[in-house]
């Protein structure tokens, strides 16, 4: 077991505000495993919180200054601001406070082979894919993934080796507090424009991320992505690229798709064939995610034949083209896509999947993203036949009245005259409308990073009533 060498001045009791989050809960699990006393708070109870309680964590529902009893350190997420009562209580008592990313960096620093998967899209899928290849190859990594991965029983698996793998999110430049030996950049797009000024600001952050990799370490980068290409100059660490262009280190060729839309392709490494690879996740975008995973595994010493065997065992994670069930001869699928590029890629994957008509229910995520990328969103639904736009999921934001889902729905209709587009607010009404109008062979796809998945569940429940 890798022992985490925390600064001993910080003591043994750590309090996590927002402990139920996907990343914070994984940090809590690691700290509990290391023998730390862990307490925390969250606004809602959940299965994740029940699991942490079962492992010894003391967790409060709701944020209150009384929750901060006697911790030696307080850790908070980016969503927890200074005026939070627990942060204010910690400040009054002179208890040290650090954010989630810094805590994760402290943990990561203790692993010789830390892998950080960054990029605007595909982080969770790629992290999961690399993790399972490593796990099946007996590398016994410690895994932190931003989703529910059935093969490890959740979002965290504690290993007993020098390998650690996690997602590295660029939001508020949190990934600049990490210590990667292998850094991966999947792609770079305009996003999180409530923090970043523009695309150049985003690229600058990724450039700083590259500089975190030691000289003997490795950067694995998407060589086909124009924005990534722009920041690959004057790199001190080892550079490995992947893509479809023959100039890359790892190149996918001879691409075809099964009847279910799953890719099959060959891979060349420096011009030499590594063989044929088959995926059990749909979409061209997942060829790129797979290439990043293949490159990482090969770098870690996994034989190509092993990678071939392990990669086709991966059947995806929750909320990534997640087939929820079938009703009236129609597949109900849910996906986390909430950026125009992700929407286009997911609908392209759906197009290659067996279907009659494609129904797409999209829940925009945050007012700032919707406003900044409104035109891009309006052009992302060309492969959908029926499009329903729900209200914007606010997440961490307040509605300023500058943008509304009805505006987006009207713009989508103008750019997709062949499609039927409507704005609908109520989830029950949406589920009822789709259930009444869908026909055998249709594919119903809910998309968004909020709670839009509930619509698919309601459609399935309606059939069982």
UniProtKB/Swiss-Prot annotation:
<dbReference type="GO" id="GO:0051301">
    <property type="term" value="P:cell division"/>
</dbReference>
<keyword id="KW-0067">ATP-binding</keyword>
<dbReference type="GO" id="GO:0008763">
    <property type="term" value="F:UDP-N-acetylmuramate-L-alanine ligase activity"/>
</dbReference>
<dbReference type="InterPro" id="IPR036565">
    <property type="entry name" value="Mur-like_cat_sf"/>
</dbReference>
<dbReference type="Pfam" id="PF02875">
    <property type="entry name" value="Mur_ligase_C"/>
</dbReference>
<comment type="pathway">
    <text>Cell wall biogenesis; peptidoglycan biosynthesis.</text>
</comment>
<keyword id="KW-0131">Cell cycle</keyword>
<feature type="binding site">
    <location>
        <begin position="119"/>
        <end position="125"/>
    </location>
    <ligand>
        <name>ATP</name>
    </ligand>
</feature>
<keyword id="KW-0133">Cell shape</keyword>
<keyword id="KW-0132">Cell division</keyword>
<dbReference type="InterPro" id="IPR005758">
    <property type="entry name" value="UDP-N-AcMur_Ala_ligase_MurC"/>
</dbReference>
<dbReference type="Pfam" id="PF01225">
    <property type="entry name" value="Mur_ligase"/>
</dbReference>
<protein>
    <recommendedName>
        <fullName>UDP-N-acetylmuramate--L-alanine ligase</fullName>
        <ecNumber>6.3.2.8</ecNumber>
    </recommendedName>
</protein>
<dbReference type="InterPro" id="IPR013221">
    <property type="entry name" value="Mur_ligase_cen"/>
</dbReference>
<dbReference type="GO" id="GO:0008360">
    <property type="term" value="P:regulation of cell shape"/>
</dbReference>
<dbReference type="GO" id="GO:0005524">
    <property type="term" value="F:ATP binding"/>
</dbReference>
<dbReference type="InterPro" id="IPR000713">
    <property type="entry name" value="Mur_ligase_N"/>
</dbReference>
<dbReference type="InterPro" id="IPR036615">
    <property type="entry name" value="Mur_ligase_C_dom_sf"/>
</dbReference>
<dbReference type="GO" id="GO:0009252">
    <property type="term" value="P:peptidoglycan biosynthetic process"/>
</dbReference>
<dbReference type="GO" id="GO:0071555">
    <property type="term" value="P:cell wall organization"/>
</dbReference>
<keyword id="KW-0573">Peptidoglycan synthesis</keyword>
<keyword id="KW-0436">Ligase</keyword>
<comment type="function">
    <text>Cell wall formation.</text>
</comment>
<keyword id="KW-0961">Cell wall biogenesis/degradation</keyword>
<dbReference type="Pfam" id="PF08245">
    <property type="entry name" value="Mur_ligase_M"/>
</dbReference>
<dbReference type="InterPro" id="IPR050061">
    <property type="entry name" value="MurCDEF_pg_biosynth"/>
</dbReference>
<dbReference type="GO" id="GO:0005737">
    <property type="term" value="C:cytoplasm"/>
</dbReference>
<keyword id="KW-0963">Cytoplasm</keyword>
<comment type="similarity">
    <text>Belongs to the MurCDEF family.</text>
</comment>
<dbReference type="InterPro" id="IPR004101">
    <property type="entry name" value="Mur_ligase_C"/>
</dbReference>
<keyword id="KW-0547">Nucleotide-binding</keyword>
